[in-house]
Amino acid sequence: MAGAFENIVVTQDWQTQGHASFATSYPGKKVFETTKLSYGTQVLWPDHCVQGTDDASLHKDLKLPTAQLILRKGYHKAVDSYSAFEEADHKTLTGLAGYLKQRGIKTVFVTGLATDFCVAWTAMDARKLGFEVYVIEDATRAIDLNGSLAAAWKQMSAKGVKRIQSGDIASA
């Protein structure tokens, strides 16, 4: 599918040790529980994609010949990072919108993990920033935490994000 795109941006979770989104950072808390942070409610995740570990590496079979940018997310220890456009505090921008606009890109296709978190936040932020947005459903995978997948699709649809399949790429 990557061959259908002239411009590809890859996001890479790049968490710090002891990241604020990790359940292990809060004694007595469990994975998928929540806690309050300065910017709102935070879902607590298992430790994952810690900088410099194999878990944080891009998969060796990922073939993206036209990838031009790898955008690392999660390196701010106190703020989670779901969206490729802004951190979970809704204040700290990643610079991706400017990067895309400078290149004249007006349409964004979103794939990856997890549909109901990073994909959804990225897609909705892209719409908010004026991009036409498609989520390629069969190129995503959800966590579906307590109905989060259905809620994410509903929110994305309400914001004008279009839901397609990889076979629809030629007609999008």
Residue ranges with predicted function:
Residues 1-107:
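Active-site alpha/beta core segments
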Residues 9-12, 132-139:
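Short internal beta-strands
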Residues 15-16, 114-118:
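Gly/Ser/Thr-rich loops at beta-strand to alpha-helix junctions
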Residues 111:
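Short beta-strand immediately N-terminal to the catalytic nucleophile in serine-hydrolase-like folds
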Residues 117-130:
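Histidine-anchored nucleotide/phosphate-binding helix
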Residues 135-149:
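Short, flexible loop segments at boundaries between secondary-structure elements
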Residues 162-171:
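Short acidic-hydrophobic, aromatic-tinged amphipathic segments that line or gate anion-handling sites
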